[in-house]
Amino acid sequence: MSIDADFSDYEDEASGDENVLPNTTTKRKASTTSSKSRAKKASTPDLRQTSLTSMTASEQIPLVTNNGNGNSNVSTQYQRLTPREHVLRRPDTYIGSIEPTTSEMWVFDSEKNKLDYKAVTYVPGLYKIFDEIIVNAADNKVRDPNMNTLKVTLDPEANVISIYNNGKGIPIEIHDKEKIYIPELIFGNLLTSSNYDDNQKKVTGGRNGYGAKLCNIFSTEFVVETADKERMKKYKQTWYDNMSRKSEPVITSLKKPDEYTKITFKPDLAKFGMDKIDDDMVSIIKRRIYDMAGTVRETKVYLNNERISISGFKKYVEMYLASDTKPDEEPPRVIYEHVNDRWDVAFAVSDGQFKQVSFVNNISTIRGGTHVNYVANKIVDAIDEVVKKENKKAPVKAFQIKNYVQVFVNCQIENPSFDSQTKETLTTKVSAFGSQCTLSDKFLKAIKKSSVVEEVLKFATAKADQQLSKGDGGLRSRITGLTKLEDANKAGTKESHKCVLILTEGDSAKSLAVSGLSVVGRDYYGVFPLRGKLLNVREASHSQILNNKEIQAIKKIMGFTHKKTYTDVKGLRYGHLMIMTDQDHDGSHIKGLIINYLESSYPSLLQIPGFLIQFITPIIKCTRGNQVQAFYTLPEYEYWKEANNNGRGWKIKYYKGLGTSDHDDMKSYFSDLDRHMKYFHAMQEKDAELIEMAFAKKKADVRKEWLRTYRPGIYMDYTQPQIPIDDFINRELIQFSMADNIRSIPSVVDGLKPGQRKVVYYCFKRNLVHETKVSRLAGYVASETAYHHGEVSMEQTIVNLAQNFVGSNNINLLMPNGQFGTRSEGGKNASASRYLNTALSPLARVLFNSNDDQLLNYQNDEGQWIEPEYYVPILPMVLVNGAEGIGTGWSTFIPNYNPKDITANLRHMLNGEPLEIMTPWYRGFRGSITKVAPDRYKISGIINQIGENKVEITELPIRFWTQDMKEYLEAGLVGTEKIRKFIVDYESHHGEGNVHFNVTLTEAGMKEALNESLEVKFKLSRTQATSNMIAFDASGRIKKYDSVEDILTEFYEVRLRTYQRRKEHMVNELEKRFDRFSNQARFIHMIIEGELVVSKKKKKDLIVELKEKKFQPISKPKKGHLVDLEVENALAEEEQSGDVSQDEDSDAYNYLLSMPLWSLTYERYVELLKKKDEVMAELDALIKKTPKELWLHDLDAFEHAWNKVMDDIQREMLEEEQSSRDFVNRTKKKPRGKSTGTRKPRAIAGSSSSTAVKKEASSESKPSTTNRKQQTLLEFAASKEPEKSSDINIVKTEDNSHGLSVEENRISKSPGLDSSDSGKSRKRSQSVDSEDAGSKKPVKKIAASASGRGRKTNKPVATTIFSSDDEDDLLPSSLKPSTITSTKASAKNKGKKASSVKKQSPEDDDDDFIIPGSSSTPKASSTNAEPPEDSDSPIRKRPTRRAAATVKTPIYVDPSFDSMDEPSMQDDSFIVDNDEDVDDYDESD
């Protein structure tokens, strides 16, 4: 027995041969005398004194009585009892009730040899006195780990119970103060214990000094026997009659070392109202002995000298569960964990009621307590995590989850507190346990994978069904509370099965449906509008369904009954459900969601033929006279259009939605219901699987494969009498899913998503080289590109295209003029769009060459020509800027790569060389990117130790934003539940683009950080995978790319084919120009020689004569936006209406007949011959070039421009970092300590010159590049003097970063031709608009572009960027210069500033697209404005039918063309005087 547990509780008996030590009479007398003397001094008798006398039980416990007269004796009324008397008088306070009690509990069935949970009748007090002894025996294991045996002997017939344990015995010596033996002290005297020192933390069962004394008091005989190996003595003593009498202790010597404690007692059954220990009591005691076998570690437990087979807590739990399982069932799986030396925990799934079996310091806490709640709450929380994710039914609370938990706990608690002396419930606070029970992830994961989650979800489903049943409809003729319902008159009556409920897409569609009801009547048709899209009930939670107004309204209107299986529709208020939505992708989705709702909730209804109907309306109507063609899908219309001369001669009307139809249209639809009402076929078995595949989240992988089957052009055939559900899903619903993917996943060719492509298209179309507000640009883009998703979304798209901080775009196609966001918050800190301005980046047109624009496949949306299917840039932009998006069934992530690496690999491919391995690369990132697996990279920031407890962080992993790091440091500074405090302080020294934290750690924090590495501690590494690179290929099919090389190869093939097409187109255009120059020269020559007379002749006669003389008819060349599709469409509409002019021949010869009179000269003739030869030379040179050579030329141009950009970025980064370091150094000089990593050099990969970088960094006196004037596109491209090519008339410059010649705006330009570079350097224009001069911003982004390029060439030729004789073809208002100067004035005032004229009124212009002449066009060097007499080419002016100077229309001219002399080039633009006519087809224009 344990002396630590409760020495007051033990006396012993042992077996063996030993000598009886003589106890002298003297000593006995001394002992007696001493006891008597103490008794005399005491005010009341002491237990030791009373124990020496023999008394009956009635004599020991005086009773309070009243006299016969009813007058009480005050002295007998108020009494003081001894502690022993109080225990006997009030036993419930100490041992619980002494009356028989019936309750259900676990007992041991000896016949079945297993535990059994049943109702038993027992006396709690008797059970308690036995439990006190056996717990003390178990406590000895704590005091002496060598204890390995515990024996219990139970003899109900003889009414004897004995409990034996080996291990350390009770010291056999006399107590110094009490002068009696310690065994007698602790077993025969109440309130004696070894557990009163509260400063000593103990994990034993004894606590209050009662324990075994209670057993002694309620026994007729109580024997203590113990052996003390240290003193080689054995002690035995007996108490009788409820501890009222005792024998003298018998102390003998041990023959051999031994130690044990044994208690034998005979319960006073009379006190418990019993005459013997009955079977129920025996079964309880036996179960308690089994408890000890399971909870006392490494101890053999015997019952009546037979060892119990249970060993260990897990086996004990399995015994419990096996006993609780029916014979034909498998017992619940036990999930067990030995947490630590003080905690053993096991879990099993319960049957709907929380169960627990628990022990505290070997005490059976049958009612649980704080220890059980502590463990159970942890388990419930873990289960709740899974349930919340998977439960779509009724919400489940923690206590409801707990009902499915069965927990077993065996723990040791320091100085435990209980609710009473019966110790059934632990009340100790968790904080005072003295240990923690931290359940491992493995243990909790095993619980999550068990059937407990399934059981909880079943409960949630049952609860949801019960709640949903409350809203069941019925066959009611009148429904209230749904004001938007237009109810059928016969709904809910005996004719309800004939009624049709029309569900419309919105209120406007409802009004149209109601107007149609005037044709068919209101008796059998009802209408109810849906607000937006119906809820996806398959993925919705119970509360979402219960609170969804549309779902509940449909259920109420139709009269649905939850969980009912329908065989007919007679019990419904409506026998049919008809869907009326727009014939677009969203309308298809709504139909699918309604089908999904019915299949998920009432699948039997879909098996009833004719129950579900859809109402179809045309999406396009084509009319020609009395003929009408209606189309219900766009692909169907496209097929018809291709087969019918592109729809020429037909009037085409697009019906965007039901709102486009008017009331007359709707009445006509309802007049022909057989055509417009399409019944769905009864649902087949495979249909249910398809519906689940389309809408269930868990079917994502299957949905991917389904979407792979999509082929553009498929459509729903509405000529069928019935629509199969599988056809609807595979032909119509799939188009909605693909539309979602198309919005979210980029093209592999241009790397753009549709929204981004719309922005790029509009900016190219408007040549947006001057900034405009983002908010306004978003409106323009949405309007002109048929964008259907709101301007806010478009504004964000524009902002994303312009962002250039680390981790965003490697090449931003738009300029971020304003606060477009920084790496501090990953761009989320961008200003509102109304404060932001943007324009095209100079690199945009280098990457997206304008010569490709006319080769693209432009799309048409409802008759409006919009962006192409994809652009074909010279680099795969999907690799340059990466991609990320989530669609339907598919998501994508493609990292950014270095444009220089991409360019190098493209060169290798063009030259037939092997490719180099490419690693992800982010512009401005200075950390490291390391390949750790074939499809995985590790991205690391930079951290260095700069002091004993100090570190410096100068780079973060990609997309680990500065604010994220700051929040992590804050958490480490104050400490949180997940992060212990390990930081003393930190400082921030970073600017907009760089990262710089100085962090001071605690001593323990630094030690911990170094142990696990600074990189890990500060989360400075992340992984990036290339295993999900998804994009649309050139054919519009979604495709997964296994490697970067796969993307590069596919792009290479598409791009090379496009170069071949570009060359063919340019050759064709040069041939046309050659024919025009040749015919114009012959025309002038014939007039000069008198072979052709044009005066005094009618135009039609002249045309006849021109045909006779074999002059070629040449139509006006397309201009402006290369392929003006909108104009083409307008012409097509005119053709349909029969308004096209029949004088086509007149237009075809305008290039001759519109030539100005002054051009009919010999000089002009010679000039045209020369131009013809130049075009021929250019054509010959172009024909010799291969597509690969054209591509290589463009790559050269890009690399030149890219290097300039990287140089600017490099200088800015160096300056920003140096600024932060200078500030730190000025504040306090920081000594450098041990470095845990190598700092990356500050130079950025891709920089053209590291020497220049070093020089810039070291020169403190050199002015910052941020003060330099922002470079315009003209300045960017005009830094060196060009020279005409030796073999063709193409101008090239060494500084031509765009790879564009002076001829760029003319179709003859060939970017693929080489030329020698030998011109003199030419100064950029220094003139800046006074307004712009003071508002230039530091060069922090790619330099801003401008609308033209200035060049000095050998032959001056004036050229405009367009050639049209119509006023509508003048330069768009958005491109008109703000200041117009006269060429004439320039010519007369050499070197002097020309007079200026004001531009047109603001009403005629769009402010956002004004090109200020001073900033858009650089000044040219000075030469004579007047051409010499022998000049082959006089100055050519802007062509127009009307004298341009009369209306003073400002004409923008690119000053790079040859006819411009130096004085005129000093002016930014010019107008044509009214006394000159110009040739509408002069190539110099």
Curated annotation (Swiss-Prot):
Span list, region Disordered:
1-76, 1216-1485
Report residues binding Mg(2+) 1.
Answer: 505, 582
Keyword field: ATP-binding, DNA-binding, Isomerase, Magnesium, Metal-binding, Nucleotide-binding, Nucleus, Phosphoprotein, Topoisomerase
For bias type Polar residues, the affected ranges are 46-59, 1260-1273, 1413-1425
What compartments host this protein? Nucleus
Residue sites binding ATP per the record: 136, 165, 193-195, 206-213, 421-423
- Note how many cofactor molecules are bound and how: Binds two Mg(2+) per subunit. The magnesium ions form salt bridges with both the protein and the DNA. Can also accept other divalent metal cations, such as Mn(2+) or Ca(2+).
Which Enzyme Commission number(s) are on file for it?
5.6.2.2
Modifications after synthesis and translation: Phosphorylated at multiple sites at both extremities of the protein.
Q: Which Gene3D superfamilies match?
A: 3.30.1360.40, 3.30.1490.30, 3.30.230.10, 3.40.50.670, Histidine kinase-like ATPase, C-terminal domain, Topoisomerase II, domain 5, Topoisomerase, domain 3
Q: Where is the composition biased (Basic residues)?
A: 1226-1242, 1387-1396
Site described as Transition state stabilizer, positions? 834
- Its biological function? Control of topological states of DNA by transient breakage and subsequent rejoining of DNA strands. Topoisomerase II makes double-strand breaks.
| Name of the protein in question | DNA topoisomerase 2
Q: What is the gene name?
A: top2
